[in-house]
Design a protein with these regions (language model features):
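Positively charged, small/polar-rich N-terminal and surface patches that mediate targeting and assembly
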Residues: 1-111
Length: 111
């Protein structure tokens, strides 16, 4: 039987460019909605938008957070993001080292 998942989550969103990803990541970490933001530049996305298949160069932003921050994180991301419909995908972290989980939890919460 698999072990229960940790309270850690990874949120994926894409941005128009590295500058926007850095701005969003910094704001969300400063506001303690994310413990860490990792930027992966130069990804290529292919998607359907308003009936047409589109392609765009984007920056992938990975946000490490906890279950208790997800609602506020999504709301704040929607406020700050330039996209009309920003991506907000949540991945469950099945396992992580206890020191990392301790750090993550201590980095979240009230500023």
């Amino acid at each position: 039987m698999p072990s229960p998942a940790t309270p850690a989550r990874i949120v994926l969103t894409t941005t128009a460019n590295p500058e926007e990803a850095a701005r969003l990541g910094r704001a969300l970490v400063e506001e303690r909605l994310a413990a860490c933001a990792t930027l992966i530049p130069a990804v290529q996305s292919i998607y359907r938008w308003q009936g047409a298949v589109e392609s765009a160069a984007e920056t992938l932003l990975l946000l490490k957070t906890g279950t208790g921050q997800l609602v506020a994180l999504e709301a704040r991301l929607r406020e700050l993001h330039s996209y009309q419909t920003p991506e907000f995908l949540v991945l469950v972290v099945e396992a992580a080292s206890q020191p990392y989980l301790d750090w993550l939890q201590s980095s979240l919460g009230q500023p």
